[in-house]
Swiss-Prot record:
It comes from Nicotiana tabacum. This is Tyramine N-feruloyltransferase 10/30. It catalyses: tyramine + (E)-feruloyl-CoA = N-[(E)-feruloyl]tyramine + CoA + H(+). The lineage of its organism: Eukaryota, Viridiplantae, Streptophyta, Embryophyta, Tracheophyta. One of its GO terms (cellular component) is cytoplasm. Homodimer.
Length: 226
């Protein structure tokens, strides 16, 4: 059951979910979701992307084979069932139904209404994303997948959807010959930490994440090439 009022969406009992590969028509939503995750981590001052630069990164300037370049999976929700008729040569959408433990109140529904459904449904909304790309390591003789981030809008957290989205990326890796799925886990976020452990991720506490960026990186620039 669902109701809409003043651009808000209320869903009770069941929500229908689709995971699909993002495309250029989704760029405005991806930009907003990327901003929201920076907001969640108090890093908005570091968010330098624009819709145009993201589009170039993810689509126009991404000549890599599927899933080797920057890739985004979107998780869409709807109060009515999806039909299993969407034909996508690159990636077959994953469909699932969730029984809700609590009512979903989405005050951003109109802002995140999907523009790229590939069908005639008018009640499809983007709830979250997974961002990943291929990486390489001397430990393996094949590429792995670097899982950069997983994010859900506030209305769709704690509903069990994270497992579907992460599991879809893991299935992509397993089915396409990638050696691993790896990424960074925030040790301060116990729920996130426990989530990845429960998904089968092995945490290596003896390693620390390092980054060379900004002025520290520019010190290495060759002035003669500027």
């Amino acid at each position: 059951m669902a109701t809409t009022n003043n651009k808000n969406l209320t869903i009770t009992e069941k929500v229908y979910v689709r995971v699909r590969l993002a495309n250029e028509a989704d760029i405005s939503h991806i930009y907003k979701l990327f901003y929201q995750i920076h907001e969640y981590h108090n890093y908005t001052h570091l968010y330098k992307a624009t819709e145009s630069s993201l589009c170039d990164l993810l689509f126009k300037a991404n000549p890599n084979p599927l899933f080797y370049g920057p890739s985004v999976l979107l998780l869409e929700v709807s109060p009515t069932p999806f039909e299993n008729t969407k034909k996508d040569e690159k990636f077959k959408p994953v469909l699932k139904t969730f029984d809700l433990r609590a009512t979903v109140e989405d005050k951003e529904a109109e802002e995140f209404k999907s523009k790229s459904c590939g069908d005639e449904k008018e009640d499809v909304f983007i709830a979250g994303y997974a961002f990943f790309y291929a990486n390489y390591s001397c430990f393996y003789d094949k590429a792995g997948i670097y899982f950069e981030s997983l994010y859900f809008r506030e209305s769709y957290r704690k509903l069990g959807m994270g497992g579907l989205l992460f599991g879809t990326v893991a299935s992509i890796a397993a089915n396409n010959g990638f050696a691993s799925v790896e990424g960074i886990v925030a040790v301060w976020n116990k729920k996130s930490y426990d989530f990845y452990v429960n998904m089968g991720v092995e945490i290596f506490d003896e390693f620390r994440y390092g980054k060379l960026v900004g002025d520290a990186l520019q010190k290495y620039a060759d002035k003669e090439k500027v």
